[in-house]
Design a protein with these regions (language model features):
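N-terminal secretory signal peptides that target proteins for export/translocation
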Residues: 1-6
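Bacterial N-terminal signal peptides
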Residues: 9-23
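Exported/periplasmic ABC-transporter solute-binding proteins
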Residues: 25-63, 67, 71-77, 84-87, ...
Length: 263
């Protein structure tokens, strides 16, 4: 992309890459390493806790952008299970012989327009006030994930293109390294609004911190999310992969706004 972006948090992203060379923030003390898209942060934390309670097995969760994980897995990152926010990355890894099989779709995600408390921009599903705020100067910065490697960032870009706002907003974007960072930019007031995952807007950390509206599904390509076992996967990773498809995990995904296969 040739658009000029406002990049915030570059130093933090660099430090994260140094401390955790194969991903972003990690959760869990032991067990197999799991690479998970950032939109899963709260849902998967709950699911991993339930999995440990039922099986006694812990897993190490690392959250980040799916595109970055794709490249890291290609380069030999020691993950056993990959939960991608874009199933195309899983297909590519499968074609390259780096997975056990083609994986399983576990959910389809949704995106929201979020405005933090104190923002003069209003959340409306038609982007009417977003467009007006762009014209009258109320909207100085809009937070999204980086479309170059974050599926939720691409969906945000597609929604803005659909509404013919992308060109006008391209110099006002605050790009998160992943969708979770973009959400933090929005909720912290670093931007007057943000477009990010519904699953994050529904999390306890965001309760009471702003307003949001669902963005129509037709404004962007479906966020079909797929999990796949990698070649190095062991028994615990395989058990977690199966657990993701069971009712306890599906209930958590549903509560965080994901659309589940078959529903």
């Amino acid at each position: 992309m040739r658009a000029v972006f406002r990049r915030v948090g570059g130093l933090l992203a660099f430090l994260a890459a140094v401390v955790l060379p194969f991903g972003g923030a990690a959760w869990g003390e032991a067990g197999p390493s799991v690479a998970a898209a950032s939109d899963l942060k709260f849902a998967l934390d709950e699911i991993a806790t339930r999995f440990r309670q039922q099986t006694g097995n812990a897993v190490r969760l690392t959250y980040g952008s799916s595109g970055n994980f794709y490249r890291q897995i290609q380069q030999g990152a020691p993950f056993e299970l990959f939960l991608s926010a874009d199933e195309d990355y899983v297909r590519r890894l499968a074609n390259e012989g780096l997975t056990v099989d083609g994986g399983e779709r576990y959910a389809t995600g949704r995106i929201v327009l979020f405005v933090p408390k104190g923002s003069t921009v209003k959340a409306d599903p038609a982007f009417a006030d977003l467009r007006a705020a762009l014209g009258d100067g109320r909207l100085r910065r809009l937070a999204i994930a980086n479309p170059e490697h974050a599926p939720y960032g691409r969906a945000a870009q597609q929604a803005l293109v659909h509404e013919k706002l992308w060109a006008a907003l391209s110099t006002r974007l605050v790009l998160g390294e992943n969708v979770s960072q973009a959400a933090q930019f929005a909720v912290s007031g670093s931007a007057q609004a943000g477009i990010f995952a519904l699953s994050l807007a529904l999390s306890p950390d965001f309760a009471g911190k702003g307003d949001y509206v669902l963005i129509p599904e037709g404004w962007h390509e479906p966020l079909r999310q797929r999990a796949v076992l990698l070649r190095r996967s062991g028994a615990t990773a395989r058990a977690l992969h199966l657990f993701l498809q069971q009712p306890p995990a599906r209930e958590v995904f549903r509560r965080y706004g994901f659309v589940l296969p078959g529903e």
